[in-house]
Amino acid sequence: MSKATKAAATETVMSRIAARASKDSGNNIQRLGDRPLEAVEVTSTGSLSLDAGLGVGGWPRGRIVELYGQEATGKTTLVLHSIIAAQKAGLGVAFIDAEHALDTKYARHLGVNVDDLYVAQPMTAEEALDLVCNLCDSSLIERREIEARAKDEKTAPDFTGMLGLIILDSVAALVPKAELEGEMGDAHVALVARMMGKAMRKMTPSAHHANVTIICINQQRMKINAGHGSPWTT
């Protein structure tokens, strides 16, 4: 079979698959060369040097970012500056305060518009992760409604004020319901890790399609009996 014949056969197969799939669904397939090249949208970190260091100019939109470091190294302060930048860009911001330690006075002093900041202080890991997933899903629904109205009115969609940044502070502070309701001596092996894995699988496509950046703050800890490699883990 010649190269041209193979290419034609592949095109036929792909056309059949595309015919059965909706253009807006995730199972639609098309050749990358047929799609317009899209630059990665970003939200500034609030730090010019970090924006430059990241290579794309800030936090990428529609992605999940882990911001980790040792205790008291300025992670939350960096995130507050990112919130300021997002608000100046006309984006809505949600702060999931699992540590129950958000200093509103300090945030206002830095320049955060705390009046327009959405804040939640969930008690359990399940509540926190469900909230992040629900925020992404709701934002995706709203985004599609705006796009549909703009298409009907033949105008450009206006996403000003829509949720664009979600902060989870922090992964290390998430407490599973079973641990919260259990006894001090009960063993709960890798509960948060399993929940985070499941949540990531749910949040990743929703965050991408809703164009929402999720920043998960995490603590850096020493590995126990680390024989080789980095002694740190998150």
Task: Annotate each predicted stretch with a short phrase.
Residues F95-D97, V119, L168, C216-I217:
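General beta-strand structural signal in soluble alpha/beta enzymes
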Residues M162-L180:
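Conserved P-loop NTPase "ATPase switch" module shared by AAA+ and STAND
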Residues P157, V189-T234:
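Phosphate-binding/switch region of NTP-binding enzymes
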Residues S2, Y68, D115-E126, E179-M195, ...:
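Flexible beta-alpha connector loops of hexameric P-loop NTPases
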